[in-house]
Amino acid sequence: MNPEATELLLAGAQELGLDVAPVLDQFAALLVLLQEGNARFNLTALKTERDIVLKHFVDSLTCLGGGHLDGNHQVVDLGTGAGFPTLPLALMRAELQFTPVDSTRKKVEFVRATAEALGLQNVRPVAGRAETLTRQPEHRDRYDRVVVRAVAALPILAELALPFLRPGGLLVAQKGPISPEELRAGQRAAGELGGRVTEVEAFTLPVLGDARTLVVVEKLRDTPDRYPRREGVPNQQPLFWSAK
């Protein structure tokens, strides 16, 4: 990691109230592994050290605000891609147990190999789609938290994520700006799925100043058995939402 990227990581984390110095070497190793993997598998569109540090590492750490991940939780990372936010979070929170999920097997294998290379004992990747995995007893109603960095509309995220959670669990969704219409649809969808939106926090990404929104959904009761709908339907026909 070059000196500029190192300073950006330290400064970005400090702005979030976090100290990455104890795991700085592991973050540097993660950056190298990501660049090497990207050359082979095209894992992410971000190529420069600056972009990776700010838009992957620091952005992933923003969900640690608010104490939503404090404690010894079982955490699903829905649509982890190249391992974000799982890998930065796992470096910072050894007490959390992560199950990063992605439908692309090469990405899941990359996350598994990278976690092993970094010596992380708290990462167990799974290949599959949420619609299928949450029909399996080992995944439905089993987790304390779901984290997701997504551009998908909130009703879609709610339908895919809430079935993973046991009652009392939280969906922590890292999104860009969210419209009032999307939020209303997300609130209705959450209610239909056994949850409720408890927090919507607008903030800016450290250093870059990009607009972000953290949405927290609490699961209050079991999700009806009819959800999630079959593969692809939540994305094609989101609950209570028709994007203009």
UniProtKB/Swiss-Prot annotation:
Keywords: Cytoplasm, Methyltransferase, rRNA processing, S-adenosyl-L-methionine, Transferase. InterPro entries: rRNA_ssu_MeTfrase_G, SAM-dependent_MTases_sf. GO terms for molecular function: rRNA (guanine-N7-)-methyltransferase activity. Pfam families: GidB. It is found in: Cytoplasm. Residues 234-244 have a biased composition (Polar residues). S-adenosyl-L-methionine binds at G79, F84, D102, S103, T104, A130, E131, R149. The keyword Magnesium does not apply. SUPFAM superfamilies: S-adenosyl-L-methionine-dependent methyltransferases. Its EC number is 2.1.1.-. GO terms for cellular component: cytosol. The keyword Acetylation does not apply. Disulfide bonds: none annotated. Residues 225-244 are annotated as: Disordered. Belongs to the methyltransferase superfamily. RNA methyltransferase RsmG family. Specifically methylates the N7 position of a guanine in 16S rRNA. HAMAP family: 16SrRNA_methyltr_G. NCBIfam families: rsmG_gidB (TIGR00138). This is Ribosomal RNA small subunit methyltransferase G. It comes from Deinococcus deserti (strain DSM 17065 / CIP 109153 / LMG 22923 / VCD115).
